[in-house]
Amino acid sequence: ETQALRSQMNPHFIFNALNSISAYVQKNEPDKAVGYLGKFARLMRLVLENSRQSEVPLKDDLEALDAYLHLERARGGEKFDYTITVDPAIDQEDTLVPPLVVQPFVENAIWHGMAGKEGKGHITLSVKRRADELIMAIEDDGVGRHAPKKMVEGEPVKKTSLATTITQARLDLVQKQKGRPAGFKYIDLPQGTRVEVSLPISEAA
C-alpha cells in the first residue's frame, strides 16, 4: 500500500522531459541536451532508489526536488526561478522524510501558479523545525488557487485533486505509523499560494 502511494511521479512529466531533450537535439543544441539528460537521469535514479524506502534522508529528497525544479524550469523556458532553503539547525543527513511527499505541491506551483502569471515567477521550498514537527513549505507568487485554471497541453484532467488525494493518503499512513500528526494546509497569499506540509520529526537511528 505504501509503495503504491509513493509511486506517483507524473508520467506526463517524463514524457515532457523526453520531448525537451528531443527538441534540444533537433535545434542542434547538444550541450543543452546533454545537460538536461544528465539531470533527468539523476532524477530518475533518485526517484527509483527513494521509492523503495518509506523514509529517506532530507538531503536526498531535496536533491531530487532540486533536479525536478531545474528540469521544469528549463523545459518551460526559464519562466520562473526557485530557491530551496533549510534551517541550518536541521541535520539534513539524519532527518528522515517520506520521499517526494511535497512533489505534487511543487508541481501544482509550476503548472497552475506559474501557468497564468505575467512575467517571471518565483517558487520557494523551505524546510524548518517547529516544536516536534518538520515543516516543508512550498510558496509561489503565481496567480493563486482561485484564479481560473489555464489548461496546459499534456496535463491530465483532475491531476491536481488526484495528487492531493494521494498525498493525503500518504500523510495519513505516516500519522498512523508514527502515532503523531501529519498533514498539509493551503494558505492563500495576496499574490500566490503557500502550502505547508507538517511531518513528525524522524531521525536516523
Q: In which residue ranges do the predicted regions lie?
A:
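Two-component histidine kinase transmitter core
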Residues: 51, 200-205
